[in-house]
Amino acid sequence: MQLYAIETGHFKLDGGAMFGVVPKALWERTNPADQYNRIDMAARSLLIEDGNRLILIDTGLGNKQSDKFFSHYALWGGYDLTSSLTKVGFHPDDITDVVFTHLHFDHCGGAILKNKNGIYEPAFKNARFWSHKDHWQWAVEPNVREKASFLPENIQPIQESGQLNLLDSSATPLGFDVLLMDGHTEKQMLPVIEYKGKTIVFTADLIPTVGHLPIPYVMGYDTRPLLTLAEKSAFLKTAVEKDYLLFLEHDAHNELISLKNTEKGVRLDKTFTLDSYFH
């Protein structure tokens, strides 16, 4: 097995939305804001090469939206999904499986392209798409709070592709299991990957950045914030006890981290890249 960090594109989001009720004076210590109160964000996917399978976890925002849409997110950094795949020696047609931790647009947008005729089509024509069945139902019949994150131009083409597979438990046929979390959205899936003697958890939107390690630091986007608090507390307790490494999807400056116990709770120990840790 070989793992690759795939940068699909950096963007910015409102810091207040990303930290909910936590005062800016606290969260900006780890996540400094620009003049518009926006913080740096990554959309970092994980590519798993395992035998004859090439599995991509999440796909970023994609590039099919309008300039007006992207103007709200201040894209920066010059990364894109296809170029990042090429950099590690692969083509979108090589991907055998795409796992969506959940279907918010910044996690699944890169799975669908708009072709030269204006038609939406899969970016990974040879891949199977994987979502949790309860989350899929949540996305196709969205609540008012999340509706703006479940874009029809993402969801409908995935549904019509004939490539969609739905999971109904934490076990998967992909060589790894997932943790199911319901605080951010219904049945968010966090892949748990055994790699070179270590356990790596793709933390998606449970812990989007290092700044979200303190238990009360919960996103304003979460549908069930009290549940997020409980899920994060239990997860971090296990993670530090079992010496997990966390792969951060949204932290533009920290890719892979280890944890330690402190008098204030579980906090950052060290930060790495996949390459620096395993090579």
Task: Please state what every model-predicted region is.
Residues M1-Q2:
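Extreme N-terminal starter segment of soluble prokaryotic enzymes
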